[in-house]
Design a protein with these regions (language model features):
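In a subset of proteins, long, contiguous C-terminal domains/tails are tracked
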Residues: 761-810
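Non-catalytic, conformational "gating/processing" segments within enzyme and secreted inhibitor domains
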Residues: 26-27, 41, 78-113, 547-583, ...
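His/Glu-based metal-binding/catalytic segments typifying zinc-dependent metallopeptidases
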Residues: 34, 123-183, 271-292, 322-324, ...
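Short alpha-helical segments and helix-capping/turn motifs at coil-helix boundaries
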Residues: 13, 30, 80-82, 137-140, ...
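Glycine-centered hinge/linker elements that transmit conformational signals in sensory
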Residues: 108-124, 579-594
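Long, low-complexity, charged/polar intrinsically disordered accessory regions
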Residues: 302-312, 328-338
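M16 family metallopeptidases and their MPP-like homologs
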Residues: 1-11, 42-71, 93-99, 150-161, ...
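Hydrophobic, small-residue-rich alpha-helical packing segments that form membrane-like cores
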Residues: 21, 26-34, 39-80, 84-91, ...
């Protein structure tokens, strides 16, 4: 930690602003701008900036490119940077959080001796008194054009800053009701009528002087065509909250859940914790820094009403984002060239035109039945690893009692491995649509469980479908039972089928507009993994499947199964066995056992294969994947260690020195224990041939670097890999996920990371050099996937790879 703090503090105390490095970073900023220019999130954000108050700082461009960061003899950039640093970087305006294992006194000394050098220039905090949105423009609707098939409706209401109300959180109280997804909620009514896929509510922005409360709705195609009906419905629901939603009981429920969540808050990644704390120090007093996000100290009805008084039809900016919205003579945002237009709204119409049948269905949530009551720890010691309790009618039952974090939580994983899910691209699509139906049917009922600290996910995978339920163990069984009933007899409706199928088609079509390196990497995964299919194959299947076919598939999915159950955490063995009986009775009663083997990775041909993809993006994408010979721990350890040693020099050479792009990295590219290295570059300027030439020149030079690695350096790099592998678990979920991965790969000893760490420790420099020479220099078993230029087509390459045997398992 100390050497890192030495370097970190000097960046702020005495930055050099070396002219050459300033220009390099200028190019890096431009590369990032270019790489993300086609992303709808950034493009839509630029529309929000363009339609905000020109007098507010938010209106300004906040990314940077070669034009805005001009660096010429007449207008050099370095003096402006130095002036900016002197004006803005003053100790009295800065906050710092250091997170480490050392005692507090030691950490304090580390900080004072290093960060004390940052000058206190007694600068005043900059304020932005202008409103975020111009009052005389409201109410208005902004329509913007999306590149991808995305449809959203957002309402943004100017409200006073809420930073001083962090102890009472009136916006959290109101947003909890507006964003609720339970029966009768705004979202539930919209979803049941096929108009929306998701809804969220909360603070959009808070500058300290003013803020916005935002309601964001992801629309279905039907919702897009009827968005003018949705707006009055939103205001009708706000009226219901205003009339009926303010109550002591609701506050006490929210307060109780916040207290429980704070009491049993799980530790996050150290870097994320430090970032969160340093940021919150800008908003909260130091004494409250740990508890501030969870504080709800008192019932504050006047504050709730004050917020609600701003949520009116005459005080709203509505944003509609859609592909090809039919704009006439649109404006274009300055840097992202996003088409948009603005038009006034009729506030009176928004208040009076709510569709009658939909408005009558709206109601506020009932008391939450999932609020945990029993928060005690189960008796017994934490088990070292899961134990196999037996096989119940073909279902493997794994159990591990674990109370090491003193939190009354548990995680349950239940995998329905089934041959039906992996037959074809069509069965893959049907599995996804079936999972969507199950999730859709559960959402309204289970939303209260999410609010009460219970979480669940139901997701398709290579061998079938997995149900994961986790959180406070007290009422976990209630949620699990309802989920099992839906899995056993899912309700599939025509409306939901049509929406889910269209969402899947949109998602698959949008992949053609992903970043180039996302497309190159995805090609590698779908071409090499058994039981996966190309986007084109899945898209064709999605367009053809029918509702009748899905209903038949729902029955076929459970006809043959290879089920696995794991129960882990603050829970008893008796519960695990009882749950297994429940699963058997509800889900597996008519199922036959059929083993479903794990998928494998296909072996690449001996010589490098070059594949060229056609993408809808101006940047060049490049991914070089070099595959190991076997899945042995020894081979995996060599690739892990090689990635550790090569990643920083590769980044330094390709991104920093050669300035080829913003997205540059070398990384382990392991799939299903098959080791590999990945070299990834996305460039706004270089061709795929130029990128490959640069990569070859780098790897040629790196051979000497690797040959000169000292024994001391090698041991240091090994320790870095081992430390990453053996990093201490911070919360129950991390352990559950690791156990579940071990069960999936059949590693009943639950010691894969220990074996891999041992193998890393044993790697010799000669072994490392041989692996580098064969895999990186000679490119044995290499797959280079690029955008543009020469190469095999995706279909031709996939056909060749499909003929290959799997990588040797050891």
């Amino acid at each position: 930690l100390e050497p890192a703090l030495d370097r970190f503090a000097q960046q702020f105390a005495a930055p050099l602003f070396t002219a050459e490095l300033v220009d390099r970073e200028r190019n890096a900023v431009h590369s990032e701008f270019s790489a993300k220019k086609m992303e709808d999130g950034r493009r839509f954000y630029s529309v929000k900036k363009a339609t905000s108050n020109p007098e507010h700082a938010f209106h300004q461009f906040a990314v940077g490119n070669l034009t805005t960061l001009e660096n010429t003899d007449d207008n050099p950039l370095r003096p402006d940077l130095i002036e900016f640093w002197k004006a803005r970087y003053s100790a009295n305006l800065m906050t710092l959080a250091v997170y480490g294992p050392q005692p507090l006194d030691t950490l304090e000394t580390m900080v004072q001796t290093r960060f004390g050098a940052i000058e206190n220039r007694n600068r005043q905090q900059r304020t932005h008194s202008a409103s975020l949105l111009e009052a005389d423009v409201l109410p208005a609707k902004v329509t913007a054009e999306a590149i991808k098939d995305v449809r959203s409706l957002s309402l943004s209401f100017p409200i006073p800053s809420q930073r001083e109300n962090y102890r009472t959180k009136p916006t959290s109280y109101i947003a909890n009701l507006l964003g609720h997804e339970g029966p009768g909620s705004l979202f539930d009514v919209l979803k049941k009528n096929g108009l929306a896929d998701s809804l969220s509510a909360g603070i959009g922005m808070d500058t300290g002087e003013n803020a916005t409360l935002d309601i964001s709705i992801a629309l279905t195609p039907e919702g897009l065509s009827r968005h003018d009906e949705i707006l009055p419905l939103v205001f009708r629901y706000i009226d219901i909250v205003r009339e009926q939603g303010i109550s002591q009981q609701r506050f006490e429920e929210m307060q109780r859940l916040a207290q429980i969540d704070f009491r049993f808050r799980e530790q996050g990644e150290p870097v994320q914790e430090a970032m969160r704390l340093s940021s919150q120090l800008q908003d909260y007093p130091a004494d409250d820094i740990l508890s501030a996000p969870w504080l709800m100290e008192r019932y504050a009805p006047d504050q709730y009403r004050n917020i609600l008084s701003r949520l009116t039809p005459d005080n709203v900016m509505v944003y509609l984002l859609a592909p090809q919205p039919g704009l006439k003579n649109p404006n274009l945002t300055q840097w992202y060239e996003t088409p948009w237009q603005i038009e006034p709204l009729n506030a009176e119409a928004l208040q009076t035109k709510a569709p009658g049948a939909l408005a009558k269905a709206l109601e506020l949530p009932l008391p939450n039945p999932f609020v945990p009551e029993n928060l005690a720890m189960v008796p017994g010691k934490t088990m070292d690893k899961p134990e196999l309790l037996g096989n119940h009618e073909g279902m493997a039952i794994w159990f591990a009692r674990d109370t090491r974090f003193n939190t009354p939580k548990a995680n349950v994983f239940f995998s329905l491995r089934t041959p039906a899910a992996r037959i074809s691209a069509r069965s893959h699509v049907l599995t996804r649509l079936l999972v969507d139906s199950i999730n859709n049917n559960l959402n309204a009922w289970a939303y209260s469980a999410r609010l009460a600290g219970l979480d669940y996910s139901i997701y398709p995978h290579l061998r079938g479908v997995t149900v994961r339920v986790g959180g406070y163990s007290d009422k976990l069984h209630t949620l699990m039972n309802r989920i099992l009933m839906q899995v056993a007899t899912p309700e599939v409706t025509r409306q939901r089928f049509d929406i889910a199928r269209q969402n899947l088609i949109d998602s698959l079509q949008n992949k053609a507009k992903d970043r180039p390196v996302e497309q190159t990497s995805e090609f590698i995964q779908t071409a090499l993994l058994e039981d996966t299919w190309s986007t084109e194959e899945k898209l064709l299947a999605a367009r053809e499947v029918t509702l009748d076919e899905l209903m038949s598939f729902a029955e076929a999915l459970l006809s043959e199964v290879d089920p696995v159950l794991m129960v882990h955490g603050n829970i008893t063995e008796a519960y695990a066995l009882n749950l297994a009986q429940q699963i058997d009775a509800i889900v597996l009663g008519k199922s036959d056992f059929a083993p479903v083997e794990r998928s494998r990775v296909r072996k690449l041909p001996a010589e490098e294969m070059l594949v060229s993809l056609s993408v809808e993006h101006p940047d060049t994408g490049y991914t070089l994947y070099t595959q190991g010979k076997t899945t042995s721990f020894e081979e995996r350890s060599r690739f892990r260690l090689l990635a550790q040693i090569i990643s920083s020099p590769f980044y330094e050479e390709i991104r920093t020195t050669r300035q080829l792009g913003y997205i540059v990295y070398a990384t382990p590219f392991e799939m299903l224990e098959t080791p590999a290295l990945g070299f990834v570059v996305q460039s706004p300027t270089a061709s795929q041939e130029a990128i490959d030439q640069a990569v070859r020149e780098f790897t040629d030079g790196f051979e000497n670097t690797l040959g000169n690695v000292s024994e001391e350096r090698l041991e240091r790099e090994k320790q870095a890999v081992i430390s990453g592998l053996m990093e201490r678990d911070r919360h129950l979920g991390e352990i559950s996920e690791r156990y579940w991965r071990e069960i999936d790969r059949g590693a009943d000893g639950f010691d894969s990371r220990e074996k891999l760490a041992k193998a890393v420790k044993a790697v010799s420099l000669e072994e490392l050099k041989t692996t580098f020479r064969n895999s990186v220099l000679n490119r044995d078993r290499a797959l280079r996937v690029v955008t543009g230029g020469e190469g095999l087509s995706a279909n031709k390459a996939r056909d060749l790879i499909l003929q290959q045997p799997p990588v040797t398992a050891k």
